[in-house]
Amino acid sequence: MTNIRKTHPLMKIINSSFIDLPAPSNISSWWNFGSLLGICLIIQILTGLFLAMHYTSDTVTAFSSVTHICRDVNYGWLIRYLHANGASMFFICLFLHVGRGLYYGSYMFLETWNIGVLLLFAVMATAFMGYVLPWGQMSFWGATVITNLLSAIPYIGSDLVQWIWGGFSVDKATLTRFFAFHFILPFVIAALAGVHLLFLHETGSNNPSGLASDADKIPFHPYYTIKDILGVLILILVLTCLVLFSPDLLGDPDNYTPANPLNTPPHIKPEWYFLFAYAILRSIPNKLGGVLALVLSILILAFIPLLHTSKQRSMMFRPFSQCLFWILVADLLTLTWIGGQPVEHPFIIIGQLASILYFLLLLVIMPITSLFENNLLKW
């Protein structure tokens, strides 16, 4: 008798995706982050669902409903902090996942990569709207500042901002629609992740060497299921430690003050995972220029396959490109630090230099270095 997992219409999809999937024998722990992102998404959807049962999206009661969740709901504090810090874990995994793709040339799978970029935008939009919901000072002013950036769009800018706000300022209409979008988007993300996997399984996984691995495949289960479970356990351990020992480590103290349109916080800044893009935005004195740089800082990922000039796919055997990759990582960490600093000397000039270096590395220096490495192969 044929095994049910190979014949049942639903089971055979799961079987071909997670059990009998032929996988390269040499993929490292850097390939764990896809499954970790799936776990993060499940954690976020489940905790978010339970939070939505007690949350009210009204400007008068939003802040107190979050307080009510933390004080009066059974394990409400745990659900709330799992959700808040789960977002941070989500972005850590996302950045490492994208970094892995850049380093090992996974962007050569065009459909998979482009859907990944779309997923990154969707997750960032969801996180931004979620940050507005507790209706603290940083929620309100963050929403005001970021939505206001759209007014830089010529001709339709100011109308567009008022359309998004649902009025003449960030108010009840804005909060209600942000809650609605924040609730629906994770399901869109889950669907996109399914398509992401679908395209990945059309080509099969990349591997650290960047070479074809058709001659050396192993079944996904048990080898990589066990490997993924180890990653999941580490993720849950880190998240649990964060939630139980220092839940507010990555948050902003200003968000424990209820939103007040008459009182602007001294330093308006987004959550830590947006600081690198925020630093790029602030480093350009012109409003429209800043907005374009902000969008391009993420959208540039979609152009990476076009900028691939090397004869080799992976950076595994390209020492000069490796050095530049780690300079890029250091540059992004610098931008993240600058994004959290006040707009004053010397932070302004450091931010501007780091922003220029970011775009120069990706658009000019790395492609030219790859061409240079191609010539080294001839010697």
Swiss-Prot record:
Heme b b566 binds at residues 97, 196. GO terms for molecular function: metal ion binding; ubiquinol-cytochrome-c reductase activity. It is found in: Mitochondrion inner membrane. One of its GO terms (cellular component) is respiratory chain complex III. Changing residue 16 to M: In strain: Isolate 1119hy. Pfam families: Cytochrom_B_C, Cytochrome_B. Component of the ubiquinol-cytochrome c reductase complex (complex III or cytochrome b-c1 complex) that is part of the mitochondrial respiratory chain. The b-c1 complex mediates electron transfer from ubiquinol to cytochrome c. Contributes to the generation of a proton gradient across the mitochondrial membrane that is then used for ATP synthesis. The cytochrome bc1 complex contains 11 subunits: 3 respiratory subunits (MT-CYB, CYC1 and UQCRFS1), 2 core proteins (UQCRC1 and UQCRC2) and 6 low-molecular weight proteins (UQCRH/QCR6, UQCRB/QCR7, UQCRQ/QCR8, UQCR10/QCR9, UQCR11/QCR10 and a cleavage product of UQCRFS1). This cytochrome bc1 complex then forms a dimer. This is Cytochrome b. The lineage of its organism: Eukaryota, Metazoa, Chordata, Craniata, Vertebrata.
